[in-house]
Amino acid sequence: IEISDIKEKLNYSNPHETSYIYTVFDQIFYGAELYEEIYDIPSKFLESGLIEKDKVLIDSEIISSLKNKFDEKLAVVTGRGKFAFSYSLKKFLNKFDLVNSVFLEDESKDLAKPNVEPLLKSIRGLNSKHCLYIGDSMEDMLMANKATDMGFKTTFCGIFGTSKKPEIKLEMFKENNVPIILESITQLPKALNLV
């Protein structure tokens, strides 16, 4: 057995069909039923997926406030694929501009965060003059800053309460002069004076 063969099989950045880790992860994440629905092959695991434990942090009030403030221009740039996003947020799916949203799991790996191109695609598609980009990672912050540096005015709102170590995330956002820092996205309407 060649080490290079093993490394190739374990490489997460390979396509789903050739990456053992990618395949196992998706089976655990989606569960047996959804995995078969997506890939048209049975899962080796029979349990329900971790996706069933997703906690949706937005609600109708938040979405309504944002849609009113931003003239219906509400899109997402997410590391998830469209299927996972749609499954978890099915209750709110029709509230987003999915045409101008980017689902990075479905895109080439070189477009992964913090590559700014997916964000710029969304900003251009929405014809946005000033974008509010909400995220909970350093990569999100870097994307927003890069978009602004490139002439696409973007205000980053950093959410720190979703982190395993929120105090460290809060400090990182403060050290980088993030203009809006919130513990939870539920605080957003109040922070933007929308309520």
Per-segment meaning from a language model:
Residues 47, 51-56, 75-132, 138-149:
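Substrate-recognition "cap/lid" segment bordering the active-site pocket of phosphatases
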Residues 133-180:
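Acidic, Mg2+-coordinating phosphoryl-transfer loop and its flanking beta/alpha structural elements
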Residues 188-195:
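Short amphipathic alpha-helix with an adjacent loop that forms part of the alpha/beta core around
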Residues 2, 6-13, 66-68, 93-94, ...:
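Alpha-helix termini
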Residues 102-110, 159-165, 186-187:
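Short, acidic/turn-prone active-site loops that include or flank metal/cofactor-
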Residues 1-53:
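A metal-dependent, Asp-based hydrolase signature
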Residues 59-71:
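Catalytic-core regions built around general acid/base machinery
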